[in-house]
Amino acid sequence: MASSTSLPAPGSRPKKPLGKMADWFRQTLLKKPKKRPNSPESTSSDASQPTSQDSPLPPSLSSVTSPSLPPTHASDSGSSRWSKDYDVCVCHSEEDLVAAQDLVSYLEGSTASLRCFLQLRDATPGGAIVSELCQALSSSHCRVLLITPGFLQDPWCKYQMLQALTEAPGAEGCTIPLLSGLSRAAYPPELRFMYYVDGRGPDGGFRQVKEAVMRYLQTLS
């Protein structure tokens, strides 16, 4: 009895099962070309570098890179120091002119650049001596009295001293006596109510005079 199973025709090729064909197409379609990997430097730079607008500098760096502003100072025009023409008026005897010039050079050459009035240098030519002195005293914040043996023997110097006290009778610190070549016993009685600068030091008391002037100028508002 002949078998019912049919054999393939001669010369025909066997066909793949449909299930295997579907799997083969699926795998082929799902395959994608591999991308070229980025270099580690470009990847890290792209991923970790934020924009300059989004990330402010750390405090330590910003304080270094930011331009520093100059310290603020009070306006020259608004300071009471500039309400007068001079910071210091130096009163001295004629024989002490060299010592007075040295003192003025020291004060004007300091970092404070103090403005000094020296009568023989700054008085108006042709002006009355008394008027020039009174004008200089009223136009100065401080008065330095260079008290020496020649100062005590000169009536004109005593007038300068009394006029300086009259200009500012209650202003503490604006009249600065500089005692040079004299003992304390020779200190004028008119000045016994205020301390003096001892000129026997190596700098002749110039530094203390400058500091006293600066202290007074700092009290001006």
Curated annotation (Swiss-Prot):
Residues 84-213 form the TIR domain. Highly expressed in liver, kidney, spleen, skeletal muscle and heart. Also detected in peripheral blood leukocytes, lung, placenta, small intestine, thymus, colon and brain. Keywords: Cell membrane, Cytoplasm, Disulfide bond, Immunity, Inflammatory response, Innate immunity, Membrane, Phosphoprotein, Ubl conjugation. The keyword Lyase does not apply. Its main location: cytoplasm. Disulfide bonds join C89-C134, C142-C174. Transmembrane segments: none annotated. GO terms for biological process: 3'-UTR-mediated mRNA stabilization; cell surface receptor signaling pathway; cellular response to bacterial lipopeptide; cellular response to lipoteichoic acid; defense response to Gram-positive bacterium; inflammatory response; innate immune response; MyD88-dependent toll-like receptor signaling pathway. InterPro entries: TIR_dom, Tol-interleuk_rcpt_adapt_Tirap, Toll_tir_struct_dom_sf. Gene3D superfamilies: Toll/interleukin-1 receptor homology (TIR) domain. One of its GO terms (molecular function) is Toll-like receptor 2 binding. It is found in: Cytoplasm; Cell membrane; Membrane. Phosphorylated by IRAK1 and IRAK4. Also phosphorylated by BTK. Polyubiquitinated. Polyubiquitination follows phosphorylation by BTK and leads to TIRAP degradation. The keyword Mitochondrion does not apply. Residues 48-67 have a biased composition (Low complexity). Changing S180L: The functional impact of this variant is unclear; it has been reported both to affect interaction with TLR2, hence attenuating TLR2 signal transduction and to have no effect on NF-kappa-B activation and TNF production. Residues 1-82 are annotated as: Disordered. (Microbial infection) The TIR domain is structurally mimicked by the TIR domain of B.melitensis protein TcpB. Adapter involved in TLR2, TLR4 and RAGE signaling pathways in the innate immune response. Acts via IRAK2 and TRAF-6, leading to the activation of NF-kappa-B, MAPK1, MAPK3 and JNK, and resulting in cytokine secretion and the inflammatory response. Positively regulates the production of TNF-alpha (TNF) and interleukin-6 (IL6). Homodimer. Also forms heterodimers with MYD88. May interact with PIK3AP1. Interacts with TLR4 and IRAK2 via their respective TIR domains. Interacts with BMX and TBK1. Interacts with EIF2AK2. Does not interact with IRAK1, nor TLR9. Interacts with TLR2. Interacts with RAGE/AGER. (Microbial infection) In case of infection, interacts with B.melitensis protein TcpB (AC Q8YF53); TcpB abolishes the TLR4-TIRAP interaction and downstream signaling. This is Toll/interleukin-1 receptor domain-containing adapter protein. The gene is TIRAP.
